[in-house]
Amino acid sequence: MKRIFLFLATNIAVLVVINIVLAVLGINSRGGTGSLLAYSAVVGFTGSIISLLMSKFIAKQSVGAEVIDTPRTEEEAWLLNTVEAQARQWNLKTPEVAIYHSPEPNAFATGASRNSSLIAVSTGLLDHMTRDEVEAVLAHEMAHVGNGDMVTLTLIQGVVNTFVVFLSRIIANLIARNNDGSQSQGTYFLVSMVFQILFGFLASLIVMWFSRQREYRADAGAAKLVGAPKMISALQRLKGNPVDLPEEMNAMGIAGDTRDSLLSTHPSLDNRIARLKSL
């Protein structure tokens, strides 16, 4: 629940900060509906796009991932060769491959585009899983890259953020209007922030739902690439090993929650396994 709260709080905080900065600069949302919608889009997409462009840098710094430029061990060479082979099957430029030190088995993919991406695995993943299972995990992350999930998630977040800002301003405009047609600036700003937080929470449910669907899709992509048995085996292995990632990276990891929830970024491992068995 801590991860979920921080995920929601971070997105809402970004919206609030951007609004405050624009207000300080004298850039406001007054005007017609078209102007308000344009203003809302600027606010809604700015944070998401910046996060996307900086995603590889943030990911590396968050977990201390070390990119493999020249393999130093047979295991590193195998990782590079496996990712390169999978990238060819997707007709993609080979992503950067990195390892980060963590006892928990996990992996994630990120990047600004399908041909500018990063796939990172933990030392715990390499220690706890067989080569077949690691291959399946890499295929799952490659499916995220090939499906363009990072970009799509950014666009969805930007769209919902836009409507969060737009609707909160519309309601604030109605509530803050005085009988003589004037408007209380303080009331307008306060009401818009309150509704922005409320709508931000509700909008996050949409983003979480999409995140869960993309996990099913990535599992299916991995099954197509390496076979469902390998992917099922990898997920079953994860069930016995609790995992953790920094809060800002959780949506990109492979591990899921023990139960389904509207606020989960991943479906439960049991449901993912059941979905794979039905393919």
UniProtKB/Swiss-Prot annotation:
- In which residues is Zn(2+) bound? H140, H144, E215
Stretches that traverse the bilayer: 4-24, 34-54, 155-175, 189-209
EC number from the UniProt entry:
3.4.24.-
**What is the top EC class of this enzyme, as a single word?**
hydrolase
This protein's GO cellular component annotations are: plasma membrane
- Could you name the active-site residues? E141
Intracellular or extracellular location(s): Cell inner membrane
Please provide the record's keywords in A-Z order. Cell inner membrane, Cell membrane, Hydrolase, Membrane, Metal-binding, Metalloprotease, Protease, Transmembrane, Transmembrane helix, Zinc
Name any cofactors this protein relies on. Zn(2+)
What family does the Swiss-Prot or TrEMBL record give for this protein? Belongs to the peptidase M48B family.
By its UniProt entry, which PANTHER family does this protein fall under? PROTEASE HTPX
Could you identify this protein by its name?
Answer: Protease HtpX homolog
Q: What is the originating organism of this protein? A: Neisseria meningitidis serogroup B (strain ATCC BAA-335 / MC58)
